Amino acid sequence: MQVSRATEMLDAEFKKWREQPLPEPIKYPLLDARYEKVRREDNTVVDCTLLIAYGIMESGRRCVLGVSVELSEAEVHWRKFLESLIARGIHGLKLIVSDNHVGLKAARMSVFPSVPWQRCQFHLQQNATAHIPRKSMQQEVHNDIRDVFNMPTRSDAEIQLKKLIRSTEKRPRTCRAGL
């Protein structure tokens, strides 16, 4: 089988998957994006954004809800992607988890204005430690943030967060920028 024929078949199957109804109710979507090099039909290679939606089903299982290759994380692309999930049956969401990217935030607020949102813990830690110049300090701050998330109660987490904020007052301003 030729590569072009295999690609056509794969594209058809992928399109069918992207348009099928969701397998069961999703209450907690996790939205993310990654950047990939993509070869176009004219053989040029361009940077593209892969928008990804994962879901946590009522059964507790995780699944990939959808993916879309776009030019950027602009609001228009995220909005189109979120609307495609609605067309496939996503509704009654309890919480959306994602990074705080400007385009995603605007699209999320436009498409799901009343659904609560939580910033992704992984991205929060990444963004916070990106402002820290030394690797040893990065790991320390990463662990401190993780401790906040791992507290058994909200009040314990708030106390731990206050300690973390106080501890950053002794650090350079660039270190505090990510928190």
Region annotations inferred by a language model:
Residues 2:
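Residues in the helix-turn-helix
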Residues 5-97, 102, 106, 110-114:
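RNase H-like nuclease fold core
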